[in-house]
Amino acid sequence: TAVNKQPWHFIVVTDKDQLQKLAEANPNAGMAAKAPLAIVVCGDMNKALEGDAREFWVQDCSAATENILLAATGMGLGSVWTGTYPSKERCDAVTKVLNLPKFLIPLNTIVIGYPDSQVTPKDKWKQENVSYNAYEGD
């Protein structure tokens, strides 16, 4: 992380009532109601950098989120990143469900469970999304 600040706090949710409330708090996290586990990744503003670098917490917590997703996949689990921040409505709803203090900002909810079936990964590579040495678009 930037200057090794590790500006995060993870809330692991296994309680069925809380999972249901998280599903209701975020329209993209409906599957949380049926999942055994969700992790809410929060930015801890008490640990964030100062000044212009303060917003690096988003990058740091996003990198941590991706690592959690990769670890879950490596364990044979299914997982999905459902965005919360920067939607004020979603942040407020998740904050209320989890009783978060003001210094914690919910970035996302990672829903984790056992997949119903094996899904073949889709090839999403698009050459037009890559430039070399400088922007090559229109």
Task: Give the location of each predicted region.
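Acidic, surface-exposed loops and disordered segments
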Residues: 1-138
